[in-house]
A protein has these predicted regions:
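A conserved beta-turn-beta hairpin within the catalytic core of GNAT-like acetyltransferases
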Residues: 7-25, 71-74, 150, 170-179, ...
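Short amphipathic alpha-helix that is part of the acyltransferase structural core
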Residues: 20-27, 89-134
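Acyl-donor-binding surface of acyltransferase catalytic domains
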Residues: 26-104, 238-243
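Conserved acetyl-CoA-binding loop-helix of GNAT-fold acetyltransferases
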Residues: 30-38, 180-185, 189-206, 225, ...
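Conserved GNAT acetyl-CoA-binding A-motif
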Residues: 43-53, 175, 204-216
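Conserved beta-strand-loop-alpha-helix junction that forms the acyl-donor binding cleft
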Residues: 50-58, 185, 214-224, 242-245
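Conserved active-site alpha-helix within GNAT-family acetyltransferase domains
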Residues: 55-70, 190, 194, 206, ...
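A conserved beta-strand-loop-helix scaffold within acyl/acetyltransferase catalytic domains
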Residues: 119-176, 180-183
């Protein structure tokens, strides 16, 4: 891990939302388990959220032996921006950058899309369901109002209506990452998500980035099919575990 991304850290955002002291670990292998567990004991952590690459099966099995519960599996895709021409968006859908005032529509779409979402928060029966829903609405709104953690917010419109959104982040000088996406139930099946993804690729190209990466739940086949049709390929996957200490 880099100095900017410690192996394990306290998540004030999750603690404020759920009312339990929470720590996160983005990449946990066998050798890091003692350090992470010691950190949690020292800081009186109640909930640890840890990700483990699926290729580290021995580590995943050790986590299970130590009381960690599997909550979800993420699959990551990547596309070389330079490898092939970026397709054009079909007529009838406009994708533009975020404008002040868009946040109300974006927040509503996030609320609709992520109600009872099959992610690691909702998979944990000890976490309040409504507060789990709020994770994604709050994420979308923060991306608009404070650009945290997003570097860009793209908004899809059909006529005067906001039909969907996508958020982008620059991981470094060569790679962009798609973070959070949503399409209004009223506009699904009309190519809105595809249009947003195409503009995300253009967003990367305009900034001279070489690659775009994106991830989702392994069960989210609809999104994965869209990515594959746009030239993305699967590159890695990881488990998300929760470990309660109370």
């Amino acid at each position: 891990m880099t100095m900017e991304t410690p192996l394990v850290y306290l998540s004030r955002l999750d603690e404020d939302r759920f009312g339990v002291r929470t720590a996160k670990c983005g990449r946990l292998g066998s050798e890091g388990i003692p350090q992470v567990m010691a950190f949690c004991r020292k800081h009186q952590v109640e909930l640890l959220i840890a990700r483990c690459p699926t290729i580290w099966l021995t580590a995943a099995q050790e986590l299970e032996r130590q009381g960690f519960l599997l909550m979800d599996t993420l699959i990551y895709f990547s596309r070389d921006i330079r490898a092939a021409r970026i397709p054009r968006v079909r007529p009838g859908i406009t994708v533009r950058g975020y404008r002040p005032g868009d946040e109300d529509g974006i927040g509503r779409i996030a609320g609709d899309c992520f109600h009872d979402y099959l992610g690691h928060y909702h998979a944990d029966s000890r976490l309040d369901r409504e507060k789990c829903d709020e994770v994604y609405t709050d994420w979308a709104l923060r991306s608009c109002l404070s650009r945290d953690p997003a570097d860009g917010v793209l908004v899809a419109c059909v006529g005067d209506d906001i039909a969907g959104f996508g958020t982008m982040h620059m991981n470094d000088s060569t790679q962009g990452e798609g973070l959070l996406f949503g399409v209004s139930p009223s506009f699904r099946g009309q190519g809105v998500y595809r249009a947003i993804m195409i503009h995300c690729l253009n967003w990367c190209a305009e900034r001279g980035l070489e690659e775009m990466t994106i991830s989702t739940q392994v069960t989210n086949l609809v999104s994965q099919k869209t990515w594959i049709r746009l030239g993305f390929e699967p590159v890695s996957s990881c488990y998300t575990f929760h470990r309660w200490f109370t």
